Amino acid sequence: DKSYFIFTNSIDLIYSIMTRLKVLDRSSVFCAPKSMDKLRQNKFIRCYDEWDKDNMRQYNFFTSRFFNAFDIELDVKPYLMMVTDVYFAEQTALDPFSDVIQIIGRFRNGVTSIEHITNVNYDLPQRSEEELCSFMDTSENVYETLRKFYDAAPNKGAREAYRAAMESLPFNRMLDRNGHKNWFAIDNYVNDALVIGYYHDNKSLHAAYL
């Protein structure tokens, strides 16, 4: 039988696919321990948190835990499929510039074919890198302005009010535990927003692949 390797970052979507296609008895899932617990609650036991080809079945599903940093060496060239459903689970959106390349790179002896099955959603925000950086700069300015008011607050009640306002701002998520700017978090925010934008329409996604 043909071997299929299917990558999608949603354990709920994986279980839905296996159920709808009636392949539960012919599938294995490679995922994080917490996801394994969820599958076992549904009486599915062929799930693993480490790759081992001895655990292969005809249909082999992988979450993002296995998108990189491990090699798949097989005597056969399987069919590679990547699945995105931006309505069901936005986290299944794959970056053609990184995720897709990393997934394909797992197969040291190549694959028979590569497919990315996806939908698009015109309601998803689509912003340029310049717009995202401008948003981040403005968010930082607003945060710093409130911090000045916080530092100059005349009493505890005022400080608590300013602190609550600061913690509600988008830029608060871009700080580390010491309150310093976290460049890694900022880069991730911008990149994730750009990737989601690719799935706004077919033309944008095709352009990202070219």
Where are these regions (language model features)?
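Short acidic, S/G/P-rich loop/turn micro-motifs used as interaction or catalytic elements
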Residues: I11-I14, K34-D37, R65-F70, D85-A93, ...
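Conserved helicase motor
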Residues: N9-I11, S28-Y48, T63-F66
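A short beta-strand element within the Helicase C-terminal
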Residues: D71-D85
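Short glycine-/polar-rich loops that comprise or flank the Walker A/P-loop
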Residues: D25, D75-P78, N109-I114
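Conserved two-lobed SF2 helicase motor
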Residues: D54-F70
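Conserved SF2 helicase motif VI
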Residues: Y87-T112
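Conserved strand-helix element at the start of the C-terminal RecA-like helicase core
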Residues: D1-K22
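The feature captures the C-terminal accessory region of ATP-dependent helicases
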Residues: L132-L210
